[in-house]
Amino acid sequence: MKQLNVHLISDYGVDALIAVSRASLERFEHLVSAEHHLWPSTTSIEKLQQVFLHIERSSFVLYSIRERIIRDTLKDFCQKRKIPCIAVLSRVIRELSSYLGIEPIHTSKEEYQTFNEDYFARIDAMNYVLTHDDGQNTWDLDEANIIIVGPSRTSKSPTSVYLSHLGYRVANIPFVNNIPLPAKLTTLENILIVGLTINPDRLIEIRKARLSISQNYDNPVYADREQILEELTNARKTFIKNNWPVIDVTHRSVEEIAAAIMKEYTMRKY
């Protein structure tokens, strides 16, 4: 049985890489013994160079990295050492077959095309959204493509999920009166931060419906008109102060909100 060291390198999570590696190696079941080495959050040349210390010549590298300079550095390192270095889903099974000298079991052209880079970019993006919903895990906001800020019930979460299906890593953060936003927001570069606002009457209507559904009547200020007016006013002031584009979501569908955000994203060329 052949031994194989598989290094999985990503600028975020490695779940997608693990999935495709295992699915590919199943074609060589009982023929190859593989050991996986996981290198998530490889977001800089410095981090990549630390990974290099662990890659031996008898290795197989799979990667998913968006930053061109990091990709090129990895490919150059592997090329000089004649180490196979494959972008995920660039004919992974075919490359494994060539490297190992073993014909894969029950493969077809269609199976090679089952997945593609966009699919796994979406998987990574969805994982990011789920772990960065409603202000969670603000420590790595610099990994996001887009950050959405807005009061409760302004469609932050569904819009984030929708954008993740397009392959964008999106975090959303609630704006709440008298609770400061993460200080990190003012230091981020090359990340689109957008503020969502809404007509106060519409927001009152939505929040009252929410309270009725949840039967949570212990928070009367949640749908109080004066509180909502103050919250929306303060939110808009914060957005303008930080030069964040403001998008009014009143009577807009999630698709329309996402389209407006993508327009800002494209205009600013992030």
Curated annotation (Swiss-Prot):
The UniProt record lists the keyword Nucleotide-binding: yes
Enzyme class: transferase
InterPro entries: Kinase-pyrophosphorylase (IPR005177), PPDK_reg (IPR026565)
Keyword entries, A-Z: Kinase, Nucleotide-binding, Serine/threonine-protein kinase, Transferase
Binding site for ADP: G150, P151, S152, R153, T154, S155, K156, S157
Entry GO MF terms: ADP binding; ATP binding; phosphotransferase activity, phosphate group as acceptor; protein serine/threonine kinase activity
EC number: 2.7.11.32, 2.7.4.27
Catalysed conversion reaction: N(tele)-phospho-L-histidyl/L-threonyl-[pyruvate, phosphate dikinase] + ADP = N(tele)-phospho-L-histidyl/O-phospho-L-threonyl-[pyruvate, phosphate dikinase] + AMP + H(+); N(tele)-phospho-L-histidyl/O-phospho-L-threonyl-[pyruvate, phosphate dikinase] + phosphate + H(+) = N(tele)-phospho-L-histidyl/L-threonyl-[pyruvate, phosphate dikinase] + diphosphate
Function (record text): Bifunctional serine/threonine kinase and phosphorylase involved in the regulation of the pyruvate, phosphate dikinase (PPDK) by catalyzing its phosphorylation/dephosphorylation.
Family statement: Belongs to the pyruvate, phosphate/water dikinase regulatory protein family. PDRP subfamily.
NCBIfam families: PRK05339.1
Name of the featured protein: Putative pyruvate, phosphate dikinase regulatory protein
Organism of origin: Neorickettsia sennetsu (strain ATCC VR-367 / Miyayama)
